Amino acid sequence: TGVDNEHPGLSGKFVAGYDPVCYMHTDVPRCILAGAGARQDDGSFDPDDGNQHGTACIGMSSATGIEADGSQSEFYGSAPDSSLIDVRIGTDVGAGPFENYLVEQEAYESAMNGIQWIIDNKDTAWPGVDESLHGIDIISLSWGITSHEGGGSDGTDMHSMILDEAMLSGIVVSVAAGNDGPDNDGLSGMGSSDLSITVGASDDGNTIDRSDDTVASYSSRGPRRDNGDNNPLNELKPEISAPGTNIIQAEGCVTSGGCSNSAGGDASGNTYTSRGSGTSYATPSVSGILALMIEACLLYTSPSPRDLRR
């Protein structure tokens, strides 16, 4: 849904952005004014959040915990020094990812378009930032795309396969398992990617005692549908679970009464009081840990996505 990176805990993190479905947003006038039919693909577009989902998710991985008055709170992400490449693959109000069947689906299907843009820009030297911020290292994807009914995806749908392509290109992918609970209906597209790290959610029962932690009741259990390759191990998804229950969120503009990005509002005065649950919030926590692993490994070697997945 985009990110309101004006939030004090996210300020200064934006490096580049892209919006493949700009024409379907509440801020469409700003998108149109950005030029090129609202599909500005040079990384200069900064997608705002009209839903709260994107801002909450990036807070779990990257928030510094800074409040609007400059004080330090305890609500920081797992990698508070990480930066943001903001690619909005759904509408800013939460619909989608959007498939425009009135035009060529291959070109305009927003999730495919956005992920392909990430792959194409994995080594891009973004203007105006330090060389250490060039390229794209991690995709944190808190969204499902195709139905899990009838056993779900076997990992050969187009969305799972493009995430495999991202992993093979050198980008680590952390993707939500979904919130379909313990019923064994498999996993939807994206969460069924062969190579990506699929993330379930845990529930700590609101205690500090780790012995009572459980898989959250809503978290999809898997496995994904058998792809017929005679290797049952690659159907065992999700690979990991992380805290996703009753999570305190960085608040986007939309959480403030009357605030609208399209009307000039922003999240610069917001804090961290909203709460939410879902594998969406578990996933960016894992993404932040992956960022820390990459940072640590770079002191000695260049880690591959498969090494990190292990």
Q: What spans do the regions from the language model cover?
A:
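Single conserved hydrophobic/aromatic residue that forms the stacking wall/gate
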Residues: 300-310
